[in-house]
Amino acid sequence: MTPFLSVLTSVLAWVAAMLVAASLGVIGPARLRETWSELRDRLWDTRRVVAVLCVVLIASAVGRPSLLDVSRLFGFQATALIYGLEGGFVAWVQATFATSELTAYFSWVYVYGYAFLLSFPAIAYLALPRTVTLRRVLVAYALNYAIGLALYTLVFAHGPRNVMPDMVTPLLFATQPDVMALTSEVNVNSNVFPSLHTSLAVTVATFAVLTREEYPRWTPVAVWLSLSVVVATMYLGIHWLTDVVAGFALAFGSVFLAYRFVDPRENAVGSDDGGEQGRSDPGTGADG
């Protein structure tokens, strides 16, 4: 088995196990059974935003190599500016806090925890009686990727491990070299501003806080994992603090726009035009 397939299989196995555990512990068997009985209607209700997200992801995957060349030639060269703003902050983080235990934890979080963090909301919010929150999450994901791709094109910047190789160690690849086979398929060294790991993780945490009445057990898990991902991006030498700050801004902006773009009254399962009248609307609390 190639390193890429080995890592991908491991990630899928870990994420599948965590999704099962979280679905049972957070959503609960009763709500899962109800979701299964109404799955077709709920999926139909989200078809448009799923299509938009798929288009954005495909465009990102196909266009990234060409846009990278555009960024390298015409983009704003931000590496020196970022380094001038924060200097050796990431190097200080590693020099001060790096231990074998923390490196193992943050490496796991960056790959496995992050994949789970982004996957579980799709199941959790699909299990709500109304799909408005799920549609907002998917729109926020699409906005993160679309705006992130645009910024990657406009801003060309290398990460701290490339700028300060004598001071910053690429801890993720030093401890788990096979992971590079997977990350190289979705990232390049100049894809650092903003940190999409940060923006997407913070997006999930923000929705978890907004839906805490529906899923009180999920909120602390999501916030902890999200903050762990944020720290991991710097601890592992992948992103600058500046990238992380920009990631927070992108996350909050994407959530705000998702709430503006998705009308909670539109085509909701259980509404009159959904064909299932008389159902109560317990999803109100989930809309924040």
Specify the residue positions occupied by each region the protein language model found.
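Transmembrane alpha-helical segments in integral membrane proteins
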Residues: 25, 108-129, 198-218
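Individual transmembrane alpha-helix segments
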Residues: 93-115, 186-198
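Membrane-embedded catalytic cores of phosphoryl/pyrophosphoryl-handling enzymes
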Residues: 175-288
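Interfacial/capping segments of alpha-helical transmembrane domains
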Residues: 66-87, 162-163
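Membrane-interface interhelical connector segments
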Residues: 158-186
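Interfacial segments of alpha-helical transmembrane regions
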Residues: 114, 118-156, 218-222
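Haloarchaeal acidic low-complexity proteome signature biased toward cell-envelope/secretome components but also
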Residues: 1-63, 77-80, 212-217, 253-288
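Hydrophobic alpha-helical membrane-insertion segments
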Residues: 51-75, 141-157
